[in-house]
Swiss-Prot record:
Regions of compositional bias (Basic and acidic residues) in chain numbering: 99-109
Name recorded for this polypeptide: Large ribosomal subunit protein mL52
Transit peptide: 1-23
Taxonomic path: Eukaryota, Metazoa, Chordata, Craniata, Vertebrata
GO biological process: mitochondrial translation; translation
Organism of derivation: Homo sapiens (Human)
GO molecular function: structural constituent of ribosome
Subcellular localization, as worded in the UniProt entry: Mitochondrion
Family (UniProt): Belongs to the mitochondrion-specific ribosomal protein mL52 family.
């Protein structure tokens, strides 16, 4: 049984993504394009055909899916940005309150006279 397993195992062709599969990816990124040519761009975003009278073709499933993914991503970015802004404002308000409390403690009236000379009562 083990021999059969090794025969089947060695008979399987291994497919992998090598460096050659990503050839040109770095150049495309430097040019402001997608690393993968089918990632985004006119070939994936524009319709494949149009009507003879010039009307655009209805959007395909892939286009609708990509549009929905982009919308969800944009909504998530806006939500996280708003959360960051709210957190930053709360932190700044907290820092202002702490500074104000510290300033009040520094500017508080200091005891003078006999209370300074006499030792503090022990409890």
């Amino acid at each position: 049984m083990a021999a059969l397993g090794t025969v089947l195992f060695t008979g399987v062709r291994r497919l992998h993504c090598s460096v050659a599969a990503w050839a040109g990816g770095q150049w495309r990124l430097q040019q402001g394009l997608a690393a993968n040519p089918s990632g985004y761009g006119p070939l994936t975003e524009l319709p494949d055909w149009s009507y003879a009278d010039g009307r655009p073709a209805p959007p395909m499933k892939g286009q609708l899916r990509r549009k929905a993914e982009r919308e969800t991503f944009a909504r998530r970015v806006v939500l996280l940005s708003q959360e960051m802004d709210a957190g930053l404002q709360a932190w700044q308000l907290r820092q202002q309150k702490l500074q104000e409390e510290q300033r009040k403690q520094e500017n508080a009236l200091k005891p003078k006279g006999a209370s300074l000379k006499s030792p503090l009562p022990s409890q």
